[in-house]
């Protein structure tokens, strides 16, 4: 795996490519945050394309494997209970990436949660173009994943 450029939280605003998606979930921010930040293994059960996610370094990082074989070693940069979960990719086998950070923001929305995902990346021009063209697919994957997470959290809240 290749090492990527280490970026910090401000990369979510300054990255050459930023894709942001949002969805409303019926679960409260506390439940959504717990699924994002405290249940790494659970991601494979609701996030489209994630085959496996395991915490590393006592929860300070994660190792993620996608269904197509892409792998990421991540460092968690921000864990703000019920409001933010952010990580950067330190190493990957994905070609072309120079830097990647994902920023998840949560806000109360009535009795549910407004979830916003920012995918912030840097790479050569052709890679950025491919990612821009992939925006509709990433958006669809996010919406499908958000609905799957919402169903999962509703089942947990109902004890089933």
Per-segment meaning from a language model:
Residues 1-57:
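Hydrophobic ligand-binding cavity/cleft-lining segments
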Residues 1-4, 121-160:
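A conserved amphipathic terminal alpha-helix motif
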Residues 24, 41-95, 114, 147-160:
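Glycine-rich portal/gate segments that line the openings of hydrophobic small-molecule binding cavities
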Residues 78, 104-110:
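Short, low-complexity Ser/Thr-rich regulatory SLiMs
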Residues 90-94, 118-125:
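Short, solvent-exposed aromatic-acidic interface loops
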Residues 96-103:
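Amphipathic hydrophobic-ligand
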């Amino acid at each position: 795996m290749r090492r990527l450029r280490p970026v910090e939280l401000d990369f979510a605003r300054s990255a050459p490519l930023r894709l942001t998606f949002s969805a409303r979930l019926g679960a409260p921010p506390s439940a959504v945050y717990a699924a994002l930040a405290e249940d790494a293994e659970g991601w494979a059960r609701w996030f489209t394309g994630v085959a496996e996610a395991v915490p590393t370094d006592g929860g300070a990082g994660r190792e993620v494997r996608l269904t197509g074989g892409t792998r990421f070693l991540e460092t968690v940069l921000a864990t703000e209970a019920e409001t933010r979960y952010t990580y950067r990719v330190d190493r990957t086998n994905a070609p072309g990436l120079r830097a990647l950070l994902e920023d998840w923001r949560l806000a109360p929305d009535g009795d549910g949660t407004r979830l916003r995902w920012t995918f912030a990346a840097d790479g050569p021009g052709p890679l950025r173009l491919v990612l821009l063209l992939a925006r509709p697919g990433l958006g669809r994957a996010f919406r499908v994943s958000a609905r799957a997470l919402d169903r999962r959290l509703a089942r947990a809240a109902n004890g089933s």
